[in-house]
């Protein structure tokens, strides 16, 4: 058997043992072999949908030493860091922006490792190889979305431009229950949340928390129906399908939480969450009926109650959404890193990002002035 060594581009995780990949990914379910492979095998992240997998791997004596989730993209959908204006500018100047390379977890605005390695030298080797691959393939750009803080310096030192954005996260301050959480908030916000929750209860809606192994195929079918409704209500096409969720339910049930709302014994709303070591990741929701406050209850309040009950450190409620602030989710800075092959465009984007970063700082400062908590020590991170 031929020994695998050096940098290799792999088009499917089927050729990599799950245990080897997961040893590098650590305890990050959204970076796990099962999660990424399910995206590909279900057809959600594939060449047909504009997500051609080209995982960058580093091998020593046929053992996987480092890896980088990498995709050749023919569009900018499903990224949650918006570069549509850059693509438009390229087009106006007669230049091609697509294809581009994307180092990220598809459809997932969650911060996590992007250079999967056990030492700094291998991380740098991956990044150097990614830049070389970008130049060799002639793509317009390389984008690394939502890396962890230790990787940011490596991206910057390699010449990538950094871009800031903001999400809203909930932190568990050792709350004993939901009422203890509410007690830390100012009167108006506390009153509003209680009113929202009361409206849902008065509508006769009750909730169940189902771990992945407890949810039936009927539960998953109902959730996907709700998920599809949410996207279509916004005149968008759903990114994910039932096959993907069923694959996750089989491969990693311990990391899945399905929140289901019932009225008169029948399901009416649902939310899909990923359970990490210390963090709950809120991903998707939907409903068959409109009830005042149902969105906030299903997506946020039930998730917060789960985190308190399970003594989890935090809840990440997804991208954007200033409405989350008044529900106890505070602003959290996130970062992406970008390399553009065209020097003049790279210079123009650098200037743009400087101005944008200043605006982001002002935005975070403004949000912090409207914290829902009584204490003054809930500063943004």
Model-derived features with residue positions:
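N-acyltransferase acceptor-side catalytic subdomain
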Residues: 1-381
